[in-house]
Amino acid sequence: MKLQALIDFMETICPPALAEEWDNVGLLLGSRSARVEKVLTCLTVDRAVVDEAIATEADCVVSHHPFPYHSGKKWTTDTTEGTLLLKLAGAHIAVYSPHTAHDSALFGINRQLAEGLGLVDVKPLYEGKLKATRAMLDGLDESDALFFENDLKGDGATLGTGRIGRFEQPRTLAALVAQVKDMLQIDRALVVGSDEKRVSTVAIGCGAADEFIDEAARKGADAILMGEARFHACEEARARNVGVVLAGHYATERFSSAILAERIARKFPELSVKPSVKESDPIRIV
């Protein structure tokens, strides 16, 4: 099949209109008319992923983070990014990134985190970016179409950034932390707030999302799950009595690569689609 068919599907489930204005999303390397048989999904394109893509003879890498992250004027071997881009281009491997469009999509990463925690009444933290329409159902398989149909019937009809929902049974912040660690399979998390703090309403922002703290507090969140945040943002959260769970940028997004690979494979059974098994978190807590 042509790469354009994969692009069309990605832009249906992760509409580019949902991406932040500063973001570099879409097809970032390659030809839309190129043939695609093997796809590799990952969080970030690095040396290990590039070598894996070449070794597995992938035709396209679908990377959550853009690569290149910023549009540039020159790509040379003077930089790591330039070296890897040239290596991918030499192997005729395309790169596509949905990034913040995937964060905010109806089935996207923030939604997946909310479902993993068992939150109910889940809505975007910031609403009003784009109204979901029946046209978004075009090109989806039956199960994906049903998912969108169900969303269109309720409050989820409004797409937006971040998520906020509530537990049917409130719990302590310590219990939320334990749940997050189990869900994301991590040993440690950074926490703002007392273990005994009562948590009912939870906001979510995968990756770097400390700008969500103000809106989370305004909407009555007792806690917010994020990947990472600056020190002063954590001070602000403490001052406003919002508990914070920092589970790591990698951990709050990497799990979704396997989910995305499964969705692409279900839509295009003729493709070989696999999540990377070589990438790893560059940060270790010792």
Question: Where do the PLM segments sit?
Answer:
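Hydrophobic structural segments
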Residues: 1-286
